[in-house]
């Protein structure tokens, strides 16, 4: 059964379409109007092994906040939809990602109990034209809408680009593990409750 989903969301601030295949090969087409954000989402798709299409048109004449946060919302919703009740998956995933002087770790529980622990610090307020505070907004929106409990922590690192990118890669690799089909579940939700 294909684990794909498409979600469209339109507000007065943004118009977004996201399509994802959880069992893809990491091919992506990303267009948000924010170059560095596109780069991060491309990295997320590649290292997660997800085929991903993102088309976002946002009110960038105001700032990048709505575009970044709302794209996180819709991406999270698409993953939640593609998981179809979280049946048969491994549920848990974790990753350590080094990027030159930076080391970031991420642990995920696809529990349908969304939560974000964010221990990431940036030494500069911007990377490219993007405000670094928006990375937390993305991850929070993504967690709340995907049903994921995410713990993301940069253990050390100086370069702002590396800190941001290692975070997206760590999220991708941890999520890749968590969404994997686990034959031991017999197609059931991996919980003593029987549902997630």
From Swiss-Prot:
Places the protein is found: Cytoplasm
Pathway this chain belongs to: Amino-acid biosynthesis; L-histidine biosynthesis; L-histidine from 5-phospho-alpha-D-ribose 1-diphosphate: step 6/9
InterPro entries in the record: IGPD_sf, ImidazoleglycerolP_deHydtase, ImidazoleglycerP_deHydtase_CS, Ribosomal_Su5_D2-typ_SF
GO cellular component: cytoplasm
Domain of life per record: Bacteria
Keywords: Amino-acid biosynthesis, Cytoplasm, Histidine biosynthesis, Lyase
Catalysed reaction, written as an equation: D-erythro-1-(imidazol-4-yl)glycerol 3-phosphate = 3-(imidazol-4-yl)-2-oxopropyl phosphate + H2O
Gene3D superfamilies: Imidazole glycerol phosphate dehydratase, domain 1
Family: Belongs to the imidazoleglycerol-phosphate dehydratase family.
Protein name: Imidazoleglycerol-phosphate dehydratase
UniProt organism field: Caulobacter vibrioides (strain NA1000 / CB15N)
The encoding gene: hisB
